[in-house]
Amino acid sequence: MTWKTKLITGAAAIAFAWPGLAAADEATDARIKALEEQLSALQSQIADLKQSTANNIADVRKEATATTVSLANGRPTISTADGAFTASFRGVFQLDAAHYDQDAAGPLATDFRRGSYGDASENDHARDLSDGANFRRARIGIEGKAFGAFDYNFLYDFGGSGTEEAGKISAAWVQYGFPVANLKLRIGAFSPPSGLEEAVSTNGSLFVERASPSETVRAIAAGDGRTAVALLAGGDNWTGTAAITGNIIGTSSFDEQTAFVGRLTYVPFRRDDSLIHVGVNTSIVFNPAAGGPDVTGAPATTNIRLRDRPEIRVDGTRLIDTGNIDADGLTAIGAEFGAQWKNLYVQTEYFDIDVDRKGALSDPDFSGWYAQAGWTITGEPRRYSAGTFDAPRPAKPFDLKKGTWGAWELGLRYSVLDLNYLAGSPGTAPVASAIRGGEQEIFTLGLNWYVNNVLRFQAAFQDVSVDRLSPGGTAFGAGAATPPAGAQVGQDFNIYSLRTQYAF
């Protein structure tokens, strides 16, 4: 075949194939166009997904940093959504009214009833305790969390004993919670628990005041506004506290007191409606507060003094009092027992107090105990938590429209505090080492009405007996202020009281 023939043949083949090639190009173009449309749609979907994801992330971030406000149990609380930061506002007022049913007062020279040593105003008040009313507590504060692991609490109090005060710090502390062993470190001003009765909040206590033995031990190295650093731990059936404490804020001294407060509790038996609590506690004063400068050759006095009021503080007079004891230290040891069965509970504590006195005089020791029981008539049990029994919550808060009356609770207590050491017999002068602080016995019958979770009323009857001998000399002041040695300066009387409390 010549080249001409080949050229003609190839041209003919192209001519016959051209329509097929054109059709193939059209199909390819259609597929490309379809792919481009799909790609465009996919790009649009991706853009929408990006925007939606960005919006969701923004919403999550906004929710994480958003704050919530609640009024659970009447307490205003502000919190971040993750709970890392919270602020709860607290408030409480306790208005106490009391009538002291005493024998009529006589002249100072013939009526020997007395109060604290060396206090002329208490000499007068002991013979005529003041009926009336006072705000035992009027507190406002804030507590909460910060950065998840930190807790804080600040509480200011305008109440007082006998008369209201201008205001003082009741609590001001910060606490860190370790991620293991439920261990917490607290530093600031607070009252480390020194016993079973001390550990319960006054907002939920069975009576308007703690039993005198418990309150006396509390005042040694604990109490509201006490500077301290403490380790606190606990599990399902135990708690433990160890604290180093100093002075109470606002207490003036030279060298401050240094002391240790420790407590350990255990629940050996527990069921849904019953439990048994046991515990031990101690308060040890290593260095009592100095009463003056420590001059070479004439060291400062470091006094320890134990005294208390008759478990009500409308009148602030103390009827038992050891006076100042110049001491190197003090050790108090306490044993606790509590039990609960449904809406009935009992608790008791015993305390032994040993004072390490300076000089050649023998070391005095004192003791006290109490037993109390509570029965909720309406059936609600007291709430046991962290080594203490807190107030019941009314199942049916007071509401006249619904015919509900809140929770009602009966309380019974007997307490004994003995601040005598080698007191001797009536009509005799004391020996050199004697301390005639007095022995106080109180029987209390109470009725509590829990209107709702924030309001309650407490009515009580107390039978008080104080047995105390005069040490003579000028213990209560010069002249007629101090009865003859061995004279009875105690008394028996009754108290009728009512507390109105609003707490959130």
Where would I find each of the regions flagged by the language model?
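Gram-negative bacterial Sec-dependent N-terminal signal peptides
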Residues: M1-A23
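Coiled-coil termination/hinge junctions
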Residues: I57-T77
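Outer membrane beta-barrel
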Residues: N73-P288, D365-K402, A407-G424
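Alpha-helical, heptad-rich or low-complexity scaffold/stalk segments
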Residues: A23-R61
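Short, surface-exposed charged micro-motifs
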Residues: T68, T77, A230, E336, ...
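Outer-membrane beta-barrel pore domains
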Residues: E26, A126-R127, Y176, P293-F504
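A short catalytic or substrate-binding loop motif that flags glycine-/basic-rich loops and adjacent residues
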Residues: V69-S70, A222-G223, D328-G329
